[in-house]
Amino acid sequence: MKFYLVGGAVRDMLLGITPKDKDWVVVGATEDEMLANGFIKIAANFPVFIHPQTKQEYALARSEKKTRNGYHGFEVNFSKYITL
């Protein structure tokens, strides 16, 4: 299980700004492993979790494939074998 800082926190750090919050992508884990490590699942359709102490957001790595027009036309794959 590896954790990668992503999103606005990375941008802020590159600009010399202290991030207000931190979001993470998790590689090499399953939903069950995250739950077993005390993370709290917060999204019904996506494996997104909150760390129990820091309250920071952790999302499992995923791949997306466009299958139809519009915002809902995606096939999403979550696997512990997806890498960045």
Swiss-Prot record:
Give EC number(s), comma-separated: 2.7.7.72
Question: Where does this protein hold ATP?
Answer: G8, R11
Against Gene3D superfamilies, the record matches this protein to:
Beta Polymerase, domain 2 (3.30.460.10)
Annotated residues for binding of Mg(2+): D21, D23
Q: Which UniProt keywords apply?
A: ATP-binding, Magnesium, Metal-binding, Nucleotide-binding, Nucleotidyltransferase, RNA-binding, Transferase, tRNA processing
Has keyword Ribosomal protein?
no
GO terms under biological process: tRNA processing
Q: Which reaction does it catalyse?
A: a tRNA precursor + 2 CTP + ATP = a tRNA with a 3' CCA end + 3 diphosphate; a tRNA with a 3' CCA end + 2 CTP + ATP = a tRNA with a 3' CCACCA end + 3 diphosphate
Report whether tRNA processing shows up as a keyword of the record: yes
InterPro entries found in the cross-reference section? NT_sf, PolA_pol_head_dom, tRNA_CCA-adding_enzyme
Single GO MF annotation: metal ion binding
Binding-site residues for CTP, renumbered to this chain: G8, R11
Q: What does this protein do?
A: Catalyzes the addition and repair of the essential 3'-terminal CCA sequence in tRNAs without using a nucleic acid template. Adds these three nucleotides in the order of C, C, and A to the tRNA nucleotide-73, using CTP and ATP as substrates and producing inorganic pyrophosphate. tRNA 3'-terminal CCA addition is required both for tRNA processing and repair. Also involved in tRNA surveillance by mediating tandem CCA addition to generate a CCACCA at the 3' terminus of unstable tRNAs. While stable tRNAs receive only 3'-terminal CCA, unstable tRNAs are marked with CCACCA and rapidly degraded.
Q: Which family does it belong to?
A: Belongs to the tRNA nucleotidyltransferase/poly(A) polymerase family.
Q: Please report the name of this protein according to its UniProt entry.
A: CCA tRNA nucleotidyltransferase
Query: Per the UniProt entry, what species is this protein from, by scientific name?
Result: Francisella novicida
